[in-house]
C-alpha cells in the first residue's frame, strides 16, 4: 500500500470515527431543552427553552409551553417578531399577593406569528415561581408547530426506562433544596383567558 493509500485509509477511518461521535452526541442537542437544568424549589427562576431545529426542514411557527402544576407568577419574555398569548386556569387554592387575591394562574404560554428557519436556533424565556417540592423533577411539556409538521416534546421516561431512548422527550427541571423565594421574576402575568388545549 502506498503512502497516499495509507493516508486516505487513515483519513477515512478518522472521518467515520468522528462522524460516529457526532451522531452519538447529536441526539442530546436535537430536542427542545430547558436551561437551567435545576433550580431551588419555591424560588423565582428564569427558564430558557432552546429550539435547535424545525420539523424535518420546515420552519417553526408556533411554540407552546405548558407550565408545571404548582408554579405561579408566570411571565413570558417578549420576543421580537413573535406574538405572546397566555392560557389561564383557576387556582385550587387562591392566595394573597401585594394586597390582592390571586385566583388564577398561567397554564400555558404560546409564542406564534414568527418564523424560525430549520437552519437556525432560537431561545424563548419565561420567569415564574417554582413549586416548593424539593427533590422533584418537573417535566415541562413543549409543543413545537411548524409550517409542515409538529413535534410534541411531552414524553417522560418511566421507571427503568432510559430517557435517551425517547424520540420526543419533555424538557426536565430538577427542584433542589428550598429557597427563600427571593430573586428575579417578581410580578404576575396578565394574559387572555382561554380553555387549556391538550398537546
Residue ranges and their predicted role:
Residues 90-118:
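Extracellular adhesion/glycan-binding regions together with long Ser/Thr-
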Residues 2-18:
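Bacterial N-terminal signal peptides that target proteins for export
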Residues 178-199:
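Histidine-centered metal-binding segments
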Residues 29-51:
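N-terminal edge beta-strand
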Residues 149-167:
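Beta-sandwich strand segments
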Residues 108-136:
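Low-complexity, intrinsically disordered segments enriched in Ser/Thr together with acidic residues
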Amino acid at each position: 500500500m502506498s503512502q497516499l493509500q495509507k493516508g486516505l485509509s487513515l483519513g477515512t477511518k478518522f472521518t467515520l470515527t468522528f462522524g460516529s461521535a457526532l451522531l452519538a452526541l447529536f441526539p442530546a442537542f436535537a430536542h427542545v431543552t430547558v436551561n437551567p437544568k435545576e433550580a431551588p424549589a419555591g424560588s423565582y427562576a428564569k427558564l430558557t427553552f432552546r429550539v435547535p431545529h424545525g420539523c424535518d426542514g420546515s420552519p417553526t411557527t408556533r411554540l407552546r409551553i405548558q407550565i408545571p402544576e404548582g408554579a405561579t407568577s408566570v411571565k413570558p419574555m417578549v420576543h421580537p417578531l413573535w406574538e405572546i398569548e397566555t392560557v389561564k386556569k383557576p387556582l385550587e387554592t387562591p392566595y394573597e399577593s401585594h394586597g390582592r387575591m390571586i385566583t388564577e394562574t398561567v397554564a400555558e404560554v404560546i409564542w406564534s406569528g414568527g418564523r424560525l428557519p430549520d437552519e437556525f436556533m432560537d431561545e424563548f424565556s419565561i420567569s415564574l415561581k417554582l413549586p416548593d417540592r424539593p427533590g422533584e423533577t418537573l417535566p415541562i411539556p413543549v409543543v413545537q408547530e411548524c409550517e409542515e409538521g409538529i413535534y410534541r416534546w411531552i414524553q417522560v421516561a418511566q421507571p427503568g426506562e432510559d430517557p435517551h431512548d425517547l424520540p420526543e422527550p419533555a424538557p426536565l427541571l430538577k427542584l433542589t433544596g428550598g429557597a427563600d423565594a427571593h430573586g428575579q421574576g417578581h410580578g404576575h402575568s396578565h394574559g387572555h383567558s382561554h380553555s387549556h388545549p391538550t398537546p
